[in-house]
Amino acid sequence: MKKAIIGRKIGMTQIFDENGKVIPVTVVEAGPCAVLQKKTEEKDGYNAIQVGFEDIREKLANKPKKGHFAKAGVSLKRIVREFRLENIDEYEVGTEIKADVFAAGDKVDVTGVSKGKGFQGTIKRWNFHRGPMAHGSKYHRAVGSMGAASDPSRTFKNKKMPGHMGNKKSTILNIEVVKVMADKNVLLIKGGIPGPNKGYVVIKDTVKA
């Protein structure tokens, strides 16, 4: 059974396994997510479910959104995502998906928006080496050569240069769910995941399985 859920990153901590080894984990509040809509291959051309996460006040939703949520019989949600699944018959509109759909040992892919770093140079953005910091050096943190001179007389596309860093969609593949705290709808996921604390993430079964 393919599984997916929307969650929110709480932060990082560490736990100990049965051998006393320290495991760094990210704490994620996963669900509950309400099923808003089912899409079928006959009607829509593909199979998918649409889910919503985190309740919001009524004034924050416009009339079409209110109608969409009312049709599903669920409260207004802040985040809405669609997951392409083949086993949509196992889901019903109006029901909830909770953290216990996953189990300890599952391998998942986690997608979020990375932390924005603003405009950064090539040393921070692309791990370039810097020049000598000696008094006589005139080259410290500059980009250096950007290409040849008369031929081809231009800078190639996708050249690594200074620019906006972070604040992009990012996915970490094939990481392990260490522990599921079903009573609190919390997942402990091994290692770090994209985004800041309180950032929204999507957790799916890994594509590498």
Swiss-Prot record:
Q: Which GO terms describe its molecular function?
A: rRNA binding; structural constituent of ribosome
Q: Which SUPFAM superfamilies match?
A: Translation proteins
Q: Which keywords appear in this protein's UniProt record, sorted alphabetically?
A: Ribonucleoprotein, Ribosomal protein, RNA-binding, rRNA-binding
Q: Which GO terms describe its cellular component?
A: cytosolic large ribosomal subunit
Could you mention a single GO BP entry for this protein? Answer: translation
Functionally, this protein is described as follows: One of the primary rRNA binding proteins, it binds directly near the 3'-end of the 23S rRNA, where it nucleates assembly of the 50S subunit.
- NCBIfam families, per this entry? L3_bact
According to UniProt, the name of this protein is: Large ribosomal subunit protein uL3
List the taxonomic lineage.
Answer: Bacteria, Bacillati, Bacillota, Clostridia, Eubacteriales
